[in-house]
């Protein structure tokens, strides 16, 4: 059974080539390459493009802040991603600073466009609402970042206090252990279970023949305990620099977090000032709208009064009809 479909791709290509030759299909990139067409674009297109870019940037920044919050919650004293958190914090801070500057430029562009006076009240209200929404979202993202950094700072302080508590507790508990280790233990040759005790005793030279046996045992135990004490001191000397380096790194990270919080606190007054200016602009727009409504009502009342005067003036209506009849007579008898 044969196929009921027919391949007409060649016909489609030939038709498109024919239409291109006769000029029925304009070039796709004609408007993009023509500078005059870009100048003829709508006045609010640049404002809308910038506003959309700022909105997209705020969305991406909020996603980064959410990731930073997850890292700050997952980090513990044994799994601390300090470097990654610092890099992400610096990146978010730069994004917020750039968005703040872009929002200031957008507001400047709005004021320049509104100064021309070629916009309706609906367009002015739209621009104002867009700017207010972007400012509110940026302020919310900044507040969220400040909360995350505050939580991070509190967690770091809690970890540092816990570490200091445990280190102090270990330092207090360590002296009894050293004293317990320094208690002299009986040497192996003093035990009756050592079968080679009689052979080892002649090999040891007597330290002092006139000294009692107890003093010799204490000297031997002190000599045997000396290497263990030296080993403990060496381990302690190796551990202390590591703890100091870790404490210094934590202190630097805590200082950087506090500095970021201070910088974000400096951004809030700028946003508050911008919101206040936007509110004043909205109040002025409302006042202008009230004045426009008053003027419209006055014009409407004046037109109604004029209409009443015209409708009540019959002599004027008779004059108008007389002029119309005279025109018809002149046209019919002299022109026709």
UniProtKB/Swiss-Prot annotation:
GO terms for molecular function: SNAP receptor activity. Residues 244-306 form the t-SNARE coiled-coil homology domain. The gene is SYP31. It is found in: Golgi apparatus, cis-Golgi network membrane; Cytoplasm; Endosome. Gene3D superfamilies: 1.20.58.70. Residues 1-314 are cytoplasmic. Residues 190-202 have a biased composition (Low complexity). Its main location: Golgi. GO terms for biological process: intracellular protein transport; vesicle-mediated transport. Residues 154-163 have a biased composition (Basic and acidic residues). Residues 23-53, 152-218 are annotated as: Disordered. Keywords: Coiled coil, Cytoplasm, Endosome, Golgi apparatus, Membrane, Protein transport, Transmembrane, Transmembrane helix, Transport. GO terms for cellular component: cell plate; endosome; Golgi apparatus; intracellular membrane-bounded organelle; membrane. The chain crosses the membrane at residues 315-335. The lineage of its organism: Eukaryota, Viridiplantae, Streptophyta, Embryophyta, Tracheophyta. This is Syntaxin-31.
């Amino acid at each position: 059974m044969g196929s009921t479909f027919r391949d007409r791709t060649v016909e489609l290509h030939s038709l498109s080539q024919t239409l291109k030759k006769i000029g029925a299909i304009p070039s796709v990139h004609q408007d993009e390459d023509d500078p005059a067409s870009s100048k003829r674009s709508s006045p609010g297109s640049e404002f809308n493009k910038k506003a959309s870019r700022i909105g997209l940037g705020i969305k991406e920044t909020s996603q980064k802040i959410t990731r930073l919050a997850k890292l700050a919650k997952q980090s513990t004293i044994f799994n601390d991603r300090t470097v990654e958190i610092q890099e992400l914090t610096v990146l978010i801070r730069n994004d917020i600073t750039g968005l703040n500057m872009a929002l200031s430029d957008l507001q400047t562009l709005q004021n320049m466009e509104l100064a021309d006076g070629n916009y309706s009240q609906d367009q002015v209200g739209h621009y104002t609402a867009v700017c207010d929404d972007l400012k509110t979202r940026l302020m919310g993202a900044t507040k969220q970042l400040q909360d995350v950094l505050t939580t991070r700072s509190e967690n770091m302080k809690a970890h540092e206090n816990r570490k200091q508590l445990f280190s102090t507790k270990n330092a207090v508990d360590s002296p009894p252990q050293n004293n317990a280790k320094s208690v002299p233990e009986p040497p192996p040759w003093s035990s009756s279970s050592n079968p080679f005790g009689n052979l080892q005793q002649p090999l040891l030279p007597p330290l002092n023949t006139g000294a009692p046996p107890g003093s010799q045992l204490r000297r031997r135990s002190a000599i045997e305990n000396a290497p263990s004490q030296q080993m403990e001191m060496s381990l302690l000397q190796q551990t202390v620099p590591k703890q100091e380096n870790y404490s210094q790194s934590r202190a630097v990270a805590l200082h950087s977090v506090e500095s970021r919080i201070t910088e974000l606190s400096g951004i809030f007054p700028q946003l508050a000032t911008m919101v206040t200016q936007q509110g004043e602009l909205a109040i002025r727009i409302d006042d202008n709208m009230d004045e426009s409504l008053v003027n419209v009502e006055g014009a409407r009342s004046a037109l109604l009064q004029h209409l009443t005067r015209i409708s009540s003036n019959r002599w004027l209506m008779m004059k108008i009809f007389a002029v119309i009849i005279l025109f018809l007579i002149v046209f019919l008898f002299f022109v026709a």
